[in-house]
């Protein structure tokens, strides 16, 4: 299969992965209305083409949370990345660091914190959920700090898990799931060898380290779902803010009031996100929510965005809407599933190339010059 654009990786990943894994990455909540709107709303935003602006010297370099980056992009936390490619979190982290952008390790990664960070010269980012088991949360934070990680993404839009109907149809969940997953692996021999056999152990590394015993996919579905905490409030997070000395980013903000609450809480940044359309179907796309949130917080904290970003053009659109940087989730997951570390590296190169073309044709010579003036109208 020819890979000439970031979107080509989706079809390639669908061919390579067993259905239960592809649809786990690809799917959303309920009827997947928000999943579709995330992509569609971004694609409908018109950039303002401006010519004769002397764009011979373009720079995508930026700084986020004290880190100098080659472009305002980070890899988002994606659970079970180590099931998409052999020790997938390590491969993705290496590709990101080679490109000069951050990789974010999910709470529910296959590879534990220590394994991933030991393979990277610079600190990765770490993502944590709000869970009933505060002991696990403290253990994860302590281990992250001990490994040298200083940037925390705290996901707050999962007090309860979303209803992802595709998982039942694909074999990811349901009583017949284990049998169906084995049968699917048998007809995907490349994945079965690379990941199923050579990618062991298939633990949820961060959870099994804490529990002191191996974990499996049933634990991902069972233990994690049982530990989401619907009673959480801003006050419950104060101990984390006092414990974590580095930058703390709140992920899952869709409302300006919540964004202002994050400022009052003392967050260093927020991620405007609807969890990639995987939680509450029917909410605003991130592209529609972003402008009002960016206006509400101004320079009081750093605004990032995710959900629906598939291309370099999408990155430029999000920056013009008010984000200082973006997180790539599905886009890198598809690339990782297709060609491992090399796939993620190539994806990031494609994203950069598309950003450079978009900036040149809108007259922006630096990231700072990508503003609302780079757009023709705002999404309604």
From Swiss-Prot:
Membrane topology annotation: Peripheral membrane protein
Signal peptide: none
Reactions the enzyme catalyzes: (S)-lactate + A = pyruvate + AH2
GO molecular function, one term: FMN binding
Pfam families linked to this entry: FMN_dh
Example GO BP: lactate metabolic process
Its EC number(s): 1.1.-.-
Residue numbers annotated as active site: 275 (proton acceptor)
Binding residues for FMN: 106, 127, 155, 251, 306-330
Domain FMN hydroxy acid dehydrogenase: 1-380
Gene3D superfamilies cross-referenced by the UniProt entry: Aldolase class I (3.20.20.70)
InterPro entries xref list: Aldolase_TIM, Alpha-hydoxy_acid_DH_FMN, FMN-dep_DH, FMN_HAD, FMN_hydac_DH_AS, LldD
Top EC group: oxidoreductase
Localisation per UniProt entry: Cell inner membrane
CDD domains xref list: alpha_hydroxyacid_oxid_FMN (cd02809)
Keywords: Cell inner membrane, Cell membrane, Flavoprotein, FMN, Membrane, Oxidoreductase
One GO CC term, this protein: plasma membrane
Domain of life: Bacteria
Residues where substrate binds: 24, 129, 164, 278
Co-factor(s): FMN
Stated role: Catalyzes the conversion of L-lactate to pyruvate. Is coupled to the respiratory chain.
Annotated family: Belongs to the FMN-dependent alpha-hydroxy acid dehydrogenase family.
Annotated protein name in UniProt: L-lactate dehydrogenase
Organism: Azorhizobium caulinodans (strain ATCC 43989 / DSM 5975 / JCM 20966 / LMG 6465 / NBRC 14845 / NCIMB 13405 / ORS 571)
